[in-house]
């Protein structure tokens, strides 16, 4: 049963993170007028799909990512060229609404035509010899029209609906929106947790066994007002003061029953693991703070938690990238789907609150990792847009696509190595 719970939790966490990320791309793409033929969660064979307006929404078998397919985002060429024989369906204005490429269709009242000239981006037309009269005709293509192949519809995208022909600013927003929506999701989750749990205060709720707070006699209800020379008004002040005092003997002042008292104690040094190869040193008194529920404090605390988590993850990512050049890199620094599954298994056992917190941190991590300037990632593609904005011309499309393809192959190789490393460490 525990395996089933972990699998369900993993699918939900993965699905939420990828859906939010890809929806960010699609939201800004559609606002910019870019056609999005497909919105996919997962990779590989399609297991479920439905169409809404011009977008096909699909869920695919392998939980290793997702994508939004945008018109003009690659070197794809129209499937029709001069010399081909196709069938066309016309509307009442004698405009082409469907270009049928095979016999796997149910359309009636269609015309067969041998294509002589065609344009699917600017002038939108097909010119050719029709079978019914063996004469040459010129047909305009309707603004909303489709290629039909194997029973599937692919909408034709005019030039002004293609990603490649948009200005740098909407391109940048479309690419940056994926990570941005991950950051927004994390922020919402942190704020939601703060509202649910309350914001921590400097009042003691519970002391931990064999920690300085218990050994010094602190009790439930004691309100800490000073550590060393540092005044305390909220729980964050406790952490800041202890970071400065470290594990040196210090005086702690607290209020109990309306009276101010003081004790001397030595904070305990602890190590908190951030990643598989890095950790953070913390100094603690060993007490659980009481929480309070107010209207606005959870928003502030949620922002602070988001900034702290983002800073820690950003520092870890920068350290990982630096280690590539300093010789300290290890695949243990990275987590693939198998590693994330293992982490979810551990977090689920701690409860739903821990799972939500982990999801928030994972969302931040996904956003930051996608901004790394590797061609296949959002960060690498943003570099191409910055180049276009500076030099007032886009990178050669063939060169850009080749570089992105190389980056994609690199990422696939890395993913395979990381996945094997995770399997070896966790299951072998």
Curated annotation (Swiss-Prot):
Cofactor or coenzyme needed: Zn(2+)
Record membrane topology: Multi-pass membrane protein
EC number: 3.4.24.-
Transmembrane domains' residue ranges: 172-194, 309-331, 352-374, 401-420
Domain PDZ, first and last residues per copy: 186-269
GO cellular component terms attached to this protein's record: plasma membrane
Keyword Protease tagged: yes
Protein's UniProt name: Putative zinc metalloprotease SAS1196
Membrane among keywords: yes
Location (main, coarse): membrane
Similarity comment text for this entry: Belongs to the peptidase M50B family.
Binding-site residues, Zn(2+): 21, 25
One GO BP: proteolysis
GO terms for MF: metal ion binding; metalloendopeptidase activity
Enzyme class label: hydrolase
Location of the active site: 22
Keywords assigned: Cell membrane, Hydrolase, Membrane, Metal-binding, Metalloprotease, Protease, Transmembrane, Transmembrane helix, Zinc
Source organism phylogeny: Bacteria, Bacillati, Bacillota, Bacilli, Bacillales
PANTHER family per the UniProt record, alphabetical: MEMBRANE METALLOPROTEASE ARASP2, CHLOROPLASTIC-RELATED, REGULATOR OF SIGMA-E PROTEASE RSEP
Location within or outside the cell: Cell membrane
């Amino acid at each position: 049963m525990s395996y089933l719970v972990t699998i369900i939790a993993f699918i939900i966490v993965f699905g939420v993170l990828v859906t939010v990320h890809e929806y960010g791309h699609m939201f800004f793409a559609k606002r910019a007028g870019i056609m999005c033929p497909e919105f996919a969660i997962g990779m590989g064979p399609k297991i479920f799909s439905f169409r809404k307006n011009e977008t096909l929404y699909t869920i695919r078998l392998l939980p290793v990512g997702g994508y939004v397919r945008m018109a003009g985002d690659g070197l794809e060429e129209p499937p029709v060229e001069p010399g081909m024989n196709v069938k066309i369906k016309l509307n009442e204005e004698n405009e082409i609404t469907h270009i049928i490429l095979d016999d796997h269709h149910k359309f009636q009242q269609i015309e067969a035509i041998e294509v002589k000239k065609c344009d699917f981006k600017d002038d939108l037309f097909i010119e050719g010899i029709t079978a019914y009269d063996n004469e040459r005709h010129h047909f305009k293509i309707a603004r909303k029209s489709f290629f039909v192949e194997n029973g599937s519809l692919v909408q034709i995208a005019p030039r002004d609906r293609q990603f490649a022909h948009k200005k740098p600013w909407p391109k940048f927003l479309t690419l940056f929106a994926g990570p941005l929506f991950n950051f927004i999701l994390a922020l919402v989750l942190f704020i939601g947790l703060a509202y649910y749990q309350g914001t921590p205060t400097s009042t003691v709720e519970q002391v931990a066994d064999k920690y300085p707070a218990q050994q010094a006699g602190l009790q439930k209800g004691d309100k800490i007002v000073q550590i060393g020379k540092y005044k305390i008004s909220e729980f964050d002040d406790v952490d800041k003061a202890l970071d400065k005092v470290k594990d040196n003997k210090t005086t702690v002042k607290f209020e109990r029953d309306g009276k101010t008292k003081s004790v001397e104690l030595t904070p305990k040094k602890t190590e908190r693991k951030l990643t598989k190869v890095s950790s953070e040193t913390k100094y603690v008194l060993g007490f659980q703070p009481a929480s309070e529920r107010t209207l606005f404090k959870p928003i502030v605390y949620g922002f602070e938690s988001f900034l702290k988590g983002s800073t820690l993850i950003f520092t870890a990512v920068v350290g990982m990238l630096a280690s590539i050049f300093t010789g300290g890199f290890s695949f243990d620094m990275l987590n693939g789907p198998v590693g994330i599954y293992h982490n979810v298994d551990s977090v689920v056992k701690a409860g739903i609150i821990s799972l939500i917190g982990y999801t928030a941190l994972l969302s931040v991590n996904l956003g930051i990792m996608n901004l790394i300037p590797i061609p296949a990632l959002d960060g690498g593609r943003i570099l191409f847009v910055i180049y276009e904005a500076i030099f007032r011309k886009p990178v050669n499309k063939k060169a850009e696509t080749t570089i992105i393809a190389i980056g994609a192959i690199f990422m696939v190789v890395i993913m395979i190595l990381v996945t094997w490393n995770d399997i070896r460490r966790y299951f072998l």
